[in-house]
């Protein structure tokens, strides 16, 4: 075994099959360091955005305005055949409908949540309290559509997305798509949304750790299924950042944390996709680029559209089934408790007897 490559060692191959990501070998230190750097960066930028009005306006006002002009210029120039635009990394790797839809849906959420937090304009109106539910549901449906798209385009076979990523469809997409739809109805207390007493957060008291966990499992499964070359960052670091904040120091503010960090990450990834990209020929621009174990041999080389060679859907199936099961359990609990208490879970609240709910409600200005 002396001098053998990591991929040549039998126990290393077995370990690969039992892991979610290919995070071992020569690049492991870069992969873990980059993921932790993204995690810390998202937490810090979220704190800047939520704690200061100026920070929020810059991050979710000025920066997106500049980037929107940039995206339009790139798209128009690329269509005209201008060389710099045709070869621009945003145009090459992030030109699919999903990434733009996710970015601007998240941005819409951030702006709407700030309106509620600071009581700007319609943010003071009672009917607008249902906006957080609506925008989160839209974001979830965007991902659900992407899951079903993958199942349709490659039923237990490889297909190449418009961003040049090899995806493998199947029942895992169906399971997780259904889980996403159920997850929408796991959101309760739609109109019980408030500004925090310190004006740093929008508080949704009934969105406690129960929803946070089932959402995170579902969304992780989505990124694992449909963003396999990005999931190490957008399925691990991006989900951990708002959850850590909401469980430790920002109780009740998870959904605002989530929107903020999602929008920040989407803007960064749209401009610098090469940061995390693994190309369809198996090469990477940076050593920390990480892929999932759906690529059986740890590479994406030699994959052919319409075939199943080099595919390992086991982990995708397990995490997608887990997402479906936990969302069924959560929704069942909500229904049973609502029937028992004779209360509508959407116009009323469900988790009022939980400590997390009480801690969140104590932070809110309830009018």
Named regions from a protein language model:
Residues 3-18:
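Short, Lys/Arg-enriched N-terminal segments with co-localized hydrophobic residues
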Residues 19-20, 80-94, 149-168, 280-311:
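Membrane-interfacial helical/loop segments at transmembrane boundaries in membrane proteins
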Residues 55-62, 125-134, 259-263:
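Cytoplasmic-side transmembrane-helix entry/capping segments in multi-pass membrane proteins
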Residues 20-119:
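An N-terminal, globular interaction/scaffold subdomain
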Residues 63-83, 110-116, 133-150, 209-225, ...:
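Hydrophobic alpha-helical transmembrane segments and adjacent interfacial helices
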Residues 26-38, 92-110, 132, 143, ...:
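Alpha-helical transmembrane segments of polytopic membrane proteins
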Residues 39-44, 234-366:
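C-terminal transmembrane-bundle signature of multipass membrane proteins
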Residues 123-252:
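Generic multipass alpha-helical transmembrane bundles of integral membrane proteins
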């Amino acid at each position: 075994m002396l001098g053998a490559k990591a991929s040549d060692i039998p126990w290393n191959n077995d370990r690969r099959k039992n892991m979610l990501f290919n995070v071992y070998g020569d690049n492991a230190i870069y992969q873990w360091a980059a993921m932790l750097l993204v995690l810390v960066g998202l937490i810090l930028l979220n704190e800047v955005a939520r704690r200061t009005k100026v920070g929020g306006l810059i991050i979710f006002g000025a920066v997106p305005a500049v980037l929107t002009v940039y995206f339009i210029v790139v798209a128009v120039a690329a269509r005209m055949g201008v060389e710099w635009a045709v070869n621009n990394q945003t145009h090459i790797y992030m030109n699919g409908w999903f990434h733009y839809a996710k970015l601007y849906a998240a941005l819409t959420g951030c702006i709407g949540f700030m309106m509620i937090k600071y009581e700007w304009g319609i943010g003071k109106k009672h009917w607008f309290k249902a906006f957080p539910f609506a925008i989160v549901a839209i974001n979830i449906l965007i991902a659900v559509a992407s899951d079903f798209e993958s199942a349709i385009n490659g039923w237990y076979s490889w297909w190449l997305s418009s961003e040049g990523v090899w995806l493998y469809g199947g029942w895992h997409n169906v399971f997780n798509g259904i889980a996403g739809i159920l997850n929408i109805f796991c959101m309760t207390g739609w109109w019980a949304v408030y500004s925090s007493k310190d004006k740093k957060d929008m508080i949704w008291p009934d969105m406690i750790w129960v929803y946070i966990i089932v959402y995170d499992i579902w969304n992780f499964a989505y990124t694992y299924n449909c963003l396999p070359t990005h999931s190490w960052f957008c399925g691990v670091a991006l989900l951990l950042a708002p959850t850590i904040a909401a469980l430790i120091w920002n109780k009740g503010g998870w959904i605002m944390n989530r929107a903020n960090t999602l929008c920040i990450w989407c803007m960064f990834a749209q401009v610098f996709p090469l940061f995390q990209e693994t190309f369809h020929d198996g090469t990477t621009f940076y050593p920390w680029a990480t892929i999932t174990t759906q690529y059986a041999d740890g590479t994406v080389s030699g994959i052919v559209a319409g075939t199943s060679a080099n595919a390992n859907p086991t982990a995708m199936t397990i995490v997608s089934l887990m997402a479906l099961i936990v969302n069924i359990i959560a929704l069942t609990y909500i229904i049973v408790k609502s029937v028992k208490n004779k209360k509508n879970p959407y116009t009323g609240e469900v988790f009022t007897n939980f400590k997390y709910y009480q801690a969140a409600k104590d932070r809110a200005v309830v009018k």
